[in-house]
Amino acid sequence: MGKFFLIAFLIVSSGLIWGSGPARRWTAEVEGGAVFSGYNDARIPNVGGTLFSLSEDLDITAKAYYRLRISYALSRRHELSLLYAPLTLKAAGRLPAAVNFTGVLFPKDTAVDGTYTFNSYRLTYRYRLVDKPRLRLDVGFTAKIRDAEIALEAPSLSASKTNVGFVPLLHLRLVWDWTAKLGLYLEADAAAAKQGRAEDVLLALNWWLSPQTQLRFGYRFVEGGADVDEVYNFAWIHYIAAGLAFVF
């Protein structure tokens, strides 16, 4: 699925560059930077499994990341966008206590490698609620497909838990231009329910390089998880983000 989104993004972006008309309805966005983990606690299964921390019991290595988004303005106030946001973090260390993970017992002091994957594919609808020269506020909804996995691997043991599911989210975007060149950019997808919660928030400085090109620097976090019979997992992921947005 990830390869499909990447290829589709490149094809559509290339077509926009060479075949765009004067309407300038398309926006292509590329974001990248460094990602690292805050808390990342798991117990699988929720009843009978052992609570452990991928970020405290093991060491998670920070790494580079990227995200791709393509958007199309249906009209002045209505917009659709597709987001491809892959994420895989690696952990390693020795378990400070025995861990029962998906029915596999990893003894105390076992050297393990851990994997945390949380790929996200999203379709977002935005409505322009406020449209002023220096202030734009969009609200809407996001349909998210979550492709997740937590895995532990030792020399003679291995176990993993995968999950693919649909998550409906509320969406918000705020663009506040302080000057003709510099402003604030806030974007968020979020939802909460009895079974868990999800938040993906970006707060960035927005620098207009030209009327069609924006450069962004900021902080993003992804937080949330699920507390259900099958899985307990909550994580806080931090991003140091830089991005470019091109309007065609």
What is the meaning of each model-derived region?
Residues 197-247:
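Predominantly the C-terminal beta-signal and adjacent terminal strand-loop region
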